[in-house]
Amino acid sequence: MNIAIVGTGYVGLVSGTCFADTGANVTCVDVDAKKIERLNNGEIPIYEPGLDELVKKNVSAGRLKFTTDLASVLDDVEIVFSAVGTPPDEDGSADLKYVLQVAKTIGENLKKYVVVVTKSTVPVGTAKKVRKAIEDELQKRGVEIEFDVASNPEFLKEGNAIKDFMSPDRVVVGVESEHAKKVLTKLYKPFLINNFRVIFMDIPSAEMTKYAANSMLATRISFMNDIANLCERVGADVNMVRAGIGSDTRIGRKFLYAGCGYGGSCFPKDVKALIKTADQNGYSMEVLKAVERVNEKQKSVLFEKLVKAFGSEDALKGKTIAMWGLSFKPETDDMRESTALVMIEKLLNAGCVVRAYDPIAMDECKRRIGDRITYCRDMYDAVLDADALLLLTEWKEFRLPGWGVIKKAMKRSLVIDGRNIFDTEELEENEFEYHCIGK
């Protein structure tokens, strides 16, 4: 089966590579000529465990190709996936200009039936706009060519995307015709054979499902952070509370971890977009507005704990603060909306010297903020002469540090754990002053 995927960002490249690995012939398209040149030279522009090897494997097998020219591949494909960016506008709504540009290009060059599938996260009603954009171009050409639009939102977790794609909890597909359903069933046949759930529904429901799923997960995070902050005030332990409520099968144990706020390319953007969609339709999403407020506040919690430990914000001036973790989560270099960016600004504004280490995201941080902080060679280098250590990202290598070595390296034995990964008793035995979230 021949398919095209427009957009070689995170979603497009992972999806295209994984489809190729199931046996499809995939052409990935991007208007960025430099990115396509890099891909054709075997350079992967994003970090995702296992992706480099999988791209090389499928390129070598002849199932995965890269080009800048969408028009040149339309005659040969049955499906065109649109996986381009939908950045938020200033008002929080999703900007569809790239999605609609793809539709326009398809309309300008279409010669036979295809299914045009939106994989980007888009508001309800986008498929109608895609259909109209294609029809407008066909009308300008004076031709009538049958096509279908569909929605197939992605549910990939950065750092675990290949496994998520190849072994999904579910595949959601929104279609408007039996023909489109038949074509997409053929594409997803390898998943059906392996008994993975492919759920077909109408297009508006598929578009809503992605926003609803991410907003539900964001809600669980903010709820637990709210509970954690209350636990600190009443003498409860949020870890015990999590165990107590997570054992209820109606609630479950996942996404019940307190911390220093969520970030990334999805949750913040999707919550804002769903709030905006509701506003545009005369409804106010009060729960999600609270979720957003709680998260923004939570990103400052570690700084507030640091100020409290030193007595005042003025007392932070000239202090050296070690930071472990820069990416918004482990196994990625993505720093979009990361708590680390908020923390760095607050620390620098307070006159602190920041020494940071992250296994993957150092280059990305330098690209974003330059040399305003010190980038350290490892986790132990970061704590050298530090007055405090802040843990922001729960990378595996941070979970069992040598506290004896760290204590000797630091000026003050102060640890503030933003992800609750350290053992309280172990730190107390090593005579550290330890603060975490929710106890």
Model-derived segments and their meaning:
Residues M1-K439:
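Structural/interface elements that position substrates and couple domains in central-metabolism enzymes
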